[in-house]
UniProtKB/Swiss-Prot annotation:
Keywords: 4Fe-4S, ATP-binding, Chromosome partition, Cytoplasm, Cytoskeleton, DNA damage, DNA repair, DNA-binding, Helicase, Hydrolase, Iron, Iron-sulfur, Isomerase, Magnesium, Metal-binding, Nucleotide-binding, Nucleus, Transcription, Transcription regulation, Ubl conjugation. It is found in: Nucleus; Cytoplasm, Cytoskeleton, Spindle. The gene is ERCC2. The lineage of its organism: Eukaryota, Metazoa, Chordata, Craniata, Vertebrata. Its cofactor is Mg(2+); [4Fe-4S] cluster. This is General transcription and DNA repair factor IIH helicase subunit XPD.
Length: 760
């Protein structure tokens, strides 16, 4: 259907539209008109992706000079594939309506691991190994050697792409990862570099967060993208953690020992080259005097190690004299390594700021701040000069150099914590240095400054106002949308007591209480008797899940649950969890029914949708607070309090509630789906917790369902499931939660749509 969204003609590839989709498009258009940033919370399963794509594509066509590109960032490969399929549907609808092929290019980009087609590289399991092997086949000096001697190993796909692929752009159309690989095999071109080259002239690019937020990768991949692009971060409720992880470095004793070995290898290589080819080292010295920008004007294949965060002015400077020659630089790294090793020999926890660390470094081993800033780039230049083909071996030393560059670049927003042992095993010495980023805005700031519109969107962003604070930006639109339903298909409830009236909670004091554990077991047992097909239960941590399940086993509760449904458990091993998920789905398909016990913040809670019968009930055992004794977390809370005036308790509750909402939101993946959302902890009933749930869940959480016993909860569930079992046809939704074009244009509907979005 063709829609008129605030004067913009939008092609929508379906015959019907949800009211919230139209409302969402209106907000999006306002954001794009204002050329600003937006934060939008849209209920899960209401067609967020297609609304985004349809509106932004229409905007691109109407104002080609205003918006040149859409950069769509998603978290996992399956999500990226989903977005590409929606885009394909949308483009074919456009072509059907217009009767001609559009000059439109949309593509997905992922790591070499998902795109490489070289027979020697594809069998490797880990991304790091794939990148290293790729570099050893495509580095410019490896290719130069191949030109001289064609018997040497090389990558024929890259050579072919380099000769022909750059002249012939990708034909217009939509490409997912498999399509790119198919083109690569057909033409004999490397799909990874083809995709990286093509994103410059694509209309829509879909890739992972890291390509924009991790400075080491963004510098290589996204540097050339134009300012007039719209960036969308989908499923962005965790975006602050992604930003923080991309800027933090952990150094253990094992890493430092491997650094030592790396340095010795480099020392030998330098001596060998000095004897055979001294000209090469002189050439590098000359380049470094001219400035790093010249030194790093290397080819795309060599840019395997990007610098973590160097501002432009540093790249234009000459490298300090003290680290220009290879021997001096290696001596410099050795002194730095010895100092960090010495710091790890502490007997108690140390916390200090980067300037304090630097002053200690200057006093002890006479290392100044300036050469440290060049460390990462200088190492990159050295590895390039020495023609080191297997870069993965040097990742420990690269990590140390990145740490040196970061610690000398940022005086604020970071802390250094040195722990002599893990709190959980205080008798085992296991020292670790955390260089921890506390300010999420540091990684995302360049994105906000560079692109004219950045949209942060997800099903669980409540409370909205905290995101602009912790990411330090000023949105032009902030809105949360409700879910218009012809029948109420979600049933949230808070179970706060067992049948014996004992308050149930996962808080630390009552965690080991046998009565609480028994009541949790009874809740699962009774729910498994009334809920059809699949139940997903989330615990607050792996440790808590293990101790609870062990206790249920001793009390015989597990045996009773097994009579109703089969049990599957998520573990920390990814492969094991995948098998458990597969079997869980099989049990639901076969009508045996299944329960999946998993962990908030784990793999299951983030990326897996339990559509229809795979998730008829989600039970959240406890409030999923993060481990509050962690020193890194304490330092971050202190920073948030001092810099952004966010109280510790507010942030912890916000963090717990967004994860709880993310977990229970897995059950509802569309308006024809239905499910129970059980919050099993009396603390959820408090106003400060309840008020931080997304608006679309809060609306259906009635006062009657706030502090139920297990029995009462089961009665509510029975009644709800009986209602849901009644036949439900598309006709029942028409005019209410599903609109045709005529209905959408009526004044009454438009008035209703205005109430869906709640602006903040």
């Amino acid at each position: 259907m063709k829609l008129n969204v605030d004067g913009l003609l939008v092609y929508f590839p379906y015959d019907y539209i949800y009211p919230e989709q139209f409302s969402y498009m209106l907000e999006l258009k306002r954001t794009l008109d204002a050329k600003g940033h937006g934060v939008l919370e849209m209920p899960s399963g209401t067609g967020k992706t297609v609304s985004l794509l349809a509106l932004i594509m229409a905007y691109q066509r109407a104002y080609p000079l205003e918006v040149t590109k859409l950069i769509y960032c998603s978290r996992t490969v399956p999500e990226i594939e989903k977005v590409i399929e929606e885009l394909r549907k949308l483009l074919s609808f456009y072509e059907k309506q217009e009767g001609e092929k559009l000059p439109f290019l949309g593509l997905a980009l992922s790591s070499r691991k998902n795109l490489c087609i070289h027979p020697e590289v594809t069998p490797l399991r880990f991304g790091k190994d794939v990148d290293g092997k790729c570099h050893s086949l495509t580095a410019s000096y490896v290719r130069a050697q191949y030109q001289r001697d064609s018997s040497l190993p090389h990558c024929r796909f890259y050579e072919e792409f380099d000769v022909h692929g750059r002249q012939v752009p990708l034909p217009t159309g939509i490409y997912n990862l498999d399509d790119l690989k198919a083109v690569g095999r057909r033409q004999g071109w490397c799909p990874y570099f083809l995709a990286r080259y093509s994103i410059l002239h694509a209309n829509v690019v879909v890739y992972s967060y890291h390509y924009l937020l991790d400075p080491k990768i963004a510098d290589l991949v996204s540097k050339e993208l134009a300012r007039k692009a719209v960036v969308v971060f989908d499923e962005a409720h965790n975006i602050d953690n992604v930003c923080i992880d991309s800027m933090s470095v952990n150094l253990t004793r094992r890493t430092l020992d491997r650094c030592q070995a790396n340095l010795e290898t480099l020392q030998k290589t330098v001596l060998r080259i000095k004897e055979t080819d001294e000209q090469r080292l002189r050439e590098e010295y000359r380049r470094l005097v001219e400035g790093l920008r010249e030194a790093s004007a290397a080819r795309e294949t060599d840019a395997h190690l990007a610098n973590p965060v160097l501002p432009d002015e540093v790249l234009k400077e000459a490298v300090p004299g003290s680290i220009r020659t290879a021997e001096h630089f290696l001596g410099f790294l050795r002194r730095l390594l010895e100092y960090v090793k010495w710091r790890l020999r502490v007997q108690h926890v140390v916390q200090e700021s980067p300037p304090a660390f630097l002053s200690g470094l200057a006093q002890r081993v006479c290392i100044q701040r300036k050469p440290l800033r060049f460390c990462a780039e200088r190492l990159r230049s050295l590895l390039y000069t020495l023609e080191i083909s297997d870069l993965t071996d040097f990742s420990p030393l690269t990590l140390l150099a990145n740490f040196a560059t970061l610690v000398s670049t940022y005086a604020k927003g970071f802390t250094i914590i040195i722990e002599p042992f893990d709190d959980r095993t205080p008798t085992i010495a296991n020292p670790i240095l955390h260089f921890s980023c506390m300010d999420a805005s540091l990684a995302i700031k360049p994105v906000f400054e560079r692109f004219q519109s950045v949209i942060i969107t997800s099903g669980t962003l409540s409370p909205l106002d905290i995101y602009p604070k912790i990411l330090d930006f000023h949105p032009v639109t902030m809105a949360t949308f409700t879910m218009t339903l012809a029948r109420v298909c979600l049933c949230p409830m808070i179970i706060g007591r067992g049948n014996d009236q004992v308050a149930i909670s996962s808080k630390f004091e009552t965690r080991e209480d046998i009565a609480v554990i028994r009541n949790y077991g009874n809740l699962l047992l009774e729910m498994s008797a009334v809920v059809p097909d699949g139940i997903v239960a989330f615990f607050t941590s792996y440790q808590y899940m293990e101790s609870t399940v062990a206790s249920w086993y001793e009390q015989g509760i597990l045996e009773n649950i097994q009579r109703n449904k089969l049990l599957f458990i998520e573990t920390q091993d990814g492969a094991e969890t995948s098998v458990a998920l597969e079997k869980y789905q099989e049990a639901c398909e076969n009508g045996r029914g299944a329960i999946l016990l998993s962990v908030a913040r784990g793999k299951v809670s983030e990326g897996i949708d339990f559509v229809h019968h795979y998730g008829r009930a989600v039970i959240m055992f406890g409030v999923p607070y993060v481990y509050t004794q962690s020193r890194i977390l304490k330092a971050r809370l202190e920073y948030l309090r001092d810099q952004f005036q966010i109280r510790e308790n507010d942030f912890l509750t916000f963090d717990a509630m967004r994860h709880a909402a993310q977990c229970v939101g897995r059950a509802i993946r569309g308006k024809t789906d239905y499910g129970l959302m059980v919050f099993a902890d009396k603390r959820f009933a408090r106003a400060d917790k309840r008020g931080k749930l997304p608006r679309w869940i809060q609306e259906h959480l009635t006062d009657a369902n706030l502090n139920l016993t297990v029995d009462e909860g089961v009665q509510v569930a029975k009644y709800f499931l009986r209602q849901m079992a009644q036949p439900f046809h598309r006709e029942d939704q028409l005019g209410l939660s599903l609109l045709s074009l005529e209905q959408l244009e009526s004044e009454e509907t438009l008035r209703r749509i205005e109430q869906i979005a709640q602006q903040l």
